[in-house]
């Protein structure tokens, strides 16, 4: 059964501006070390960062918290299965909230271009 859904769209140039202006401080506040390593290893790193930003926002919507109740950006981590399929992993307070809702699985879909990144998360029991 679907317990929650979330979707978000991000303007890639906005993320590029934040990275340019705040550098490692921005990256470290939003992304986990593994996410930073992955994105920086790709030619289109800014698009990848934007897609992960959108995924984290979508996940916040799927569990219904936003950035309230002790939930942080690092509570949501985008990974990849060996075949390339994106995954959403909940940590800390976000994991507690998702489990409290009965959530056992999060489905993530992301897409990005030079201008936009979009992500959708479905929380399922």
Curated annotation (Swiss-Prot):
GO terms for biological process: fatty acid biosynthetic process. InterPro entries: 4-PPantetheinyl_Trfase_dom (IPR008278), 4-PPantetheinyl_Trfase_dom_sf (IPR037143), ACPS (IPR002582), Ppantetheine-prot_Trfase_dom (IPR004568). Keywords: Cytoplasm, Fatty acid biosynthesis, Fatty acid metabolism, Lipid biosynthesis, Lipid metabolism, Magnesium, Metal-binding, Transferase. It holds the Pfam family ACPS. It catalyses: apo-[ACP] + CoA = holo-[ACP] + adenosine 3',5'-bisphosphate + H(+). It comes from the Bacteria. It is found in: Cytoplasm. Gene3D superfamilies: 4'-phosphopantetheinyl transferase domain (3.90.470.20). GO terms for molecular function: holo-[acyl-carrier-protein] synthase activity; magnesium ion binding. Its cofactor is Mg(2+). Mg(2+) binds at residues 8, 57. Its EC number is 2.7.8.7. One of its GO terms (cellular component) is cytoplasm. Its main location: cytoplasm. Belongs to the P-Pant transferase superfamily. AcpS family. Transfers the 4'-phosphopantetheine moiety from coenzyme A to a Ser of acyl-carrier-protein. NCBIfam families: acpS, pantethn_trn, PRK14660.1. This is Holo-[acyl-carrier-protein] synthase. It comes from Koribacter versatilis (strain Ellin345).
């Amino acid at each position: 059964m679907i317990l929650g859904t979330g979707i978000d769209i991000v303007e890639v140039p906005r993320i590029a501006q934040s990275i340019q202006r705040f550098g490692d401080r921005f990256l470290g506040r939003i992304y986990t070390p593994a996410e930073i390593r992955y994105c920086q290893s790709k030619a289109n790193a800014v698009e990848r960062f934007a897609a992960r930003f959108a995924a984290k926002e979508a996940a916040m919507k799927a569990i219904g918290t936003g950035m309230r109740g002790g939930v942080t950006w690092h509570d949501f981590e985008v990974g990849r299965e060996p075949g390339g399929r994106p995954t959403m992993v909940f940590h800390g307070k976000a994991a507690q909230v998702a489990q409290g809702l009965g959530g056992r699985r999060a489905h993530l879909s992301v897409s990005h271009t030079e201008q936009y990144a979009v992500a959708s998360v479905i929380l399922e029991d």
